[in-house]
A protein has these predicted regions:
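Alpha-helical transmembrane spans of integral membrane proteins, capturing the lipid-embedded, hydrophobic core
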Residues: 19-31, 61, 65, 69, ...
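Membrane-helix interface motif
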Residues: 35-46, 82-98, 125-128, 167-168
């Protein structure tokens, strides 16, 4: 039977390798679902749509852009990101505000990266704590505090960068 320190080391290795795998998977899933969503909801010329949407969004007051951007961010944090994004646009709410300037491929890529880190960190922290409780494995001292700090930092950085992104 493995000792407690071996179990802790196994948990840490498992956590770090899964974090990288999950992160890459979430990014690939998000990119794929966004692209599928855009191929389904954008039958007209993409460049024409981008220019007209950017003009509309630029004339919106900052507070309106910020509020609708935060709504878009909340939808982007759902596990099925692409489906949430498609639903948001299919009901034409996305035409109202900040979602419009986010409809360029580069900004969309940034949004994918910004939402991937908090999704992965939150999922992994929950999974590690649940598995350790079920298997009665004691986590290394300070692990949960460090993991939650990392999660809070990733959410904070994502929100700050998102606000910068939407205010451009």
């Amino acid at each position: 039977m493995p000792t407690m320190s071996q179990q802790r080391l196994t948990v840490l290795r498992w956590y770090s390798s899964l974090r990288l795998y999950f992160l890459l998977s979430v990014i690939l899933i998000q990119v794929g679902s966004y692209m599928l969503g855009y191929s389904l909801i954008l039958p007209r010329s993409y460049l024409t749509m981008l220019s007209s949407e950017a003009e509309k969004a630029a004339s919106m007051p900052f507070l309106d852009r910020l509020i609708s951007g935060l709504v878009g961010l909340a939808i982007a944090y759902t596990p099925y990101v692409g489906i949430g994004w498609m639903s948001y646009n299919l009901i034409n709410v996305g035409e109202l505000g900040l979602i419009s300037p986010l409809q360029s491929i580069v900004q969309l890529f940034y949004l994918v990266i910004l939402t991937a880190f908090p999704i992965v960190d939150g999922t992994l922290i929950t999974t590690v704590v649940a598995v350790s409780r079920i298997n009665k494995v004691q986590l290394p001292s300070g692990f949960l505090r460090t993991a939650l700090t990392q999660y809070a930092v990733s959410i904070g950085i994502s929100l700050i960068l998102f606000i910068i992104l939407i205010s451009l």
